[in-house]
Design a protein with these regions (language model features):
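Positively charged, small/polar-rich N-terminal and surface patches that mediate targeting and assembly
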Residues: 1-125
């Protein structure tokens, strides 16, 4: 049976990043990419005061954490992420799940699951 690659993209508050990384590491999710992003969702930004004037801030700072899993159940990742991130307030974020058709490790040419697996005996420099 061929193992399926699934990409999980989590967009949430920057203040939750360390808790999210720790929780994902505990369930075996170690490889991830994190980006600082700005977005507007249902909360549509907020107002800030600068030098006595009020300004609309339409884009709110967020982080995006992306990971690809094949052994760890997707539902487990979703459950853990929601548990860590949910405050019940606007701005908790979104999680997107994508099926991947392939992945390529550029250095070796490995494809599919082998492209994201740890290779025994190899160390990053």
């Amino acid at each position: 049976m061929e193992r399926k690659l699934t990409k999980i993209e989590i967009i949430t508050r920057p203040s939750k990043l360390e808790d999210l990384k720790d929780a994902l590491n505990k369930i075996g999710v170690h490889g991830m990419t994190v980006s600082q992003v700005y977005g507007a969702g249902l909360q549509r930004g907020h107002k800030e005061v600068y030098r006595g004037r009020e300004y609309d801030v339409n884009l709110v700072p967020k982080i995006t954490l992306e990971t690809v899993v094949f052994e760890i159940p997707v539902e487990k990742v979703l459950e853990v992420a929601q548990k860590v991130l949910r405050t019940g307030k606007f701005g908790d974020g979104k999680i997107f799940v994508y099926e991947l058709s392939d992945a390529v490790r550029i250095r070796t040419g490995h494809r599919g699951v082998e492209a994201i697996m740890d290779i025994p005996g190899e160390k990053a420099e």
